[in-house]
Amino acid sequence: MTNKISFRDIINRKDWENPVITNWHRLPIHTEMNYSKSLNEDKQKTIQSLNGNWCFSYFSKVTDVPENWADRDLTKSNIMPVPSNWQLHGYDQPIYSNVAYPFPANPPYLPEENPTACYSRIFQLNDDWLQSGQNHVIFNGVGSAFHLWLNGQWIGYSEDSRLPAEFDLTKYLKSGKNRISVMVLRWSKGSYFEDQDMWRMSGIFRDVEVKHLPATYLQDYQLQTDLDDDLDQAKITIKAQVAGKNFSQNKLRTRLYFANEKVADQSSRLSTRAVDERGPLDNQFIAELNLKDPYLWSAELPYLYQLVIELLTDDGDILQVEKVNIGVRKVEIKNGLLKLNGKPLLIRGTNKHEFDSKKGYAVDEETMIQDIKAMKRNNFNAVRCSHYPNNRRWYELCDQYGLYVVDEANIETHGMVPMNRLTNDPVYLPLMSDRVTRMVTRDRNHPSIIIWSLGNESGYGRNHAALYNWIKQSDLSRPVQYEGGGANTAVTDIIVPMYARVEQDQIESVNSKWSLKKWIGLPGETRPLILCEYAHDMGNSLGGFGKYWQAFHKYPRLQGGFIWDWVDQGLLKKDVNGNDFYAYGGDFKDQPNDRQFCLDGLLFPDRTPKPAMHEVKYWQQYYLFNLQRNPLGQAESFTVTNDYSFKKSSNERLHYQIKSENEIVIDKYIDLVLNPGESLLIKLPKGRSSTSSLLDIDISLIKGNSWAPSGFKIASEQYVLAKKFGPTNAVTAATNKISLIENKDTNTFEIKLDDQKWQFAKNSGLLVSWSKSGNENLLDALRDQFTRAPLDNDIGVSKVDHIDPNAWYERWKSAGMYNLKTNLVSIDAEQLERAVLIRTEHSYSNHFQILFKSSKIYRIDANGTMTVTVDVSLAQGIPFPARIGLTCHLADQITDVSYTGLGPFENYPDRQSAAQYGHWQMELDDLYTPYIFPSENGSRGQVSQLEFGKQKISAYHEQNFSFNLSRFSKQQLARISHRNLLQAENGVWLSIDGYRMGVGGDDSWSPSVAPEYLLSNNYYHYAFQWCRKDI
């Protein structure tokens, strides 16, 4: 199409609704190029950035854009930074949606209200650039479609938010000032293919730059590394295409360096190798470099060679130089296993959106490096670019630091009914082909990319089959994966289910999810299985994570998975008081929205880790431990195994300690020298005290590396050798007199001991007062509790207008557990010689149905210790409760807490493998986990002793407990929608639980707490002792 087209014709033509038009005049995509003229030339000599402030005008629909907008006076315009999303700068609104389209779905058509923004800026190029060669502008990310003008001349059009759009400006540039103008539409028919679970935002959100190309230049090049079966001979093939003028006599010189030393080189002319019976490509160079005993790239050892490619004239003058880091490695599926360099991989992966809480899609390099270092420090080795190609710099960093990458096409039609409505329609094949073939062409030279993905949640259509075949013919070096259509269709080389469970089948009318164990055993199924999504970390989650890793280690064809997902997508926003808070769906009055479903990362939006990250790091660690005991059960030795596939232990120091209750008995260090898969047996010294309780082991880096400092802990383990630390439960001999009084004025049983007083209300049977020297300890009575402030996993998919009756929260509410009627069955008191006993029995009912019965014995001894013994029975058929415990509101002004139990971080019964038993001290506020959507949080389990303020609580008869101490009541946590709205209450809320349900986390939309972590018994017993420390 000619460039001479009026603005009105562009508006009327509606390219953004034409299903077969994806671009006008956009240049073919290629691998990243710098077009340098010498080996050490500064990039700024061939690349000019157009990032910065652009003039900006916003319109609610494209038909409102004035015809002369590109010629308007820029001094009267608003300013918009590039890169950015305009919704984060006061225009329009972000929309968070998981599945539903943010507009009426009628492909390829779009609503008239289609927000449109017009960007303009002035730039000036070096006059030398205008004398010869070409000048191209590259927009690396624009959502969702745009038209481009230069100096009033229409240049072209492009779609696909996540891949570069390059245009030739050469003919329309002038000396001096040039005006570039871009009209960006929020929605296009491409938006039907960009229905990912994310904030929907728009704008120019990646770099914009102008590049100067020589008159004759390298148009693209493709690298291919081949290894022989012994992996000691490598061939690197470079296929380069040249474009421009008079290139028939040009030469290509390739040189390969490792650690600044040249290891191979070759010069070549245009290839005469025939492609088919009609002959060779007339613009292709082919070079082959051979290596003996190459250093092989892996995520563990990311060895990179530097390849220098020079385009030369016939006389040897340099026209263009490109430098690129390359990795030599071999990816294959063999014998049912995904292998790298001949060894099976175990994918320790995470999904990752491009997201920044302040900048939206505009993620900068500093944040990318921060993410990669955090991944490496927490034992990740892989990342899935969910669900679109990332910024080009991301792949370079993954090459450098060492991460395996699944590169995913920008295709998701989750909101279509059926899901494959578009992907099965040949009309949309060109659009889909654009997104797949351009991704592969741009990114194929990165060693970190080991798998291509056809997209996400788009059903299974004929177009997928066509694109799968294209990739398999175009790139022989990588497998292809795709989950849509059931995770095991003909267009995936790997079974890639979402949220399949280890042992439980999930039967659906279409595309059932088999258990992992069943899937790999299906008749005729020989492919490896890697979960493309699992372990949904929404809020307080990731319970049962270890079951997956036990299965991964047991069954070779279960080769890991990608956790959902990396970082909470909470956008920083100001509340009515001007304070920052993290917003989720609906906070911008966005419709439709999926509320807090965007808060499902391992990191909070500020990229601080959630407690669940400890569990992930533990199960993904590269060193495995095993304790050996003799027939008498005594620990004699332990082994440590190097679970790396390629990396020898040479920079790791093992440290182990054996601790008794009061001292460190043994403290030793060993510098490890272990080959991959090799184990070391470490014998424990004999003659240890029989009271030695714990064996603590950790492995740390001796020297710092690219992602962690010296001394950084990469693996840990703890074994209980004997009885755990804890109180003896011995009652101190008491001489003080304790008395029981029935106070008719207050209708209480009153126990007095020196200046302490306990009061039990006769009409409620509750401990309603505990004072010392007239200072009250309780603000509210000590009560049974069976519920928790609901987790996201408890709520499931329930909404105000859509209730999921299967969700735990709905079950608990339907059973009346949040509104139980308490009935005192009996209360009696007994004076003993050195103690007072209070016995109570309560029933808890809903609509005359008794759900729980609780019997308690309070023994208050003359030494001031109150022993509480509780027996709870559950009615048949009621929903399993969240907890069996007691709670009260304390008057103490607590600042510090110490306890002996699992810690130091938050842990729950199904998420405590990483927690270690010990004595922990912290501030009260450090017990709180600031989940953006408030819920139950802050638990510490397996506690034998707890001290706070002037209080001490101890386990009784070796039955440990869990506790919470919080400035927020359970009721407030359940009621408030955002953490910034929580109000610290007077005093502190204490929960002491004998039993707690797990948190679950296989997914967040169906009950996922494993049976062994449910409170499914009909009877529970627990006890503890409570006293003041200042008696």
UniProtKB/Swiss-Prot annotation:
Organism expressing this protein natively: Oenococcus oeni (strain ATCC BAA-331 / PSU-1)
NCBIfam families reported for this sequence: PRK09525.1 (NF007074)
Cofactors, names only: Mg(2+); Na(+)
Entry protein name: Beta-galactosidase
Binding residue positions for Mg(2+) 1: 412, 414, 457
Similarity remark: Belongs to the glycosyl hydrolase 2 family.
Note on cofactor: Binds 2 magnesium ions per monomer. Binds 1 sodium ion per monomer.
UniProt entry tagged with the keyword Transit peptide: no
Organism placement in taxonomy: Bacteria, Bacillati, Bacillota, Bacilli, Lactobacillales
Coiled-coil segments on the chain, per record: none
Molecular-function GO term, any one: beta-galactosidase activity
This protein's encoding gene: lacZ
Annotated residues for binding of substrate: 98, 197, 457, 533-536, 600, 1005
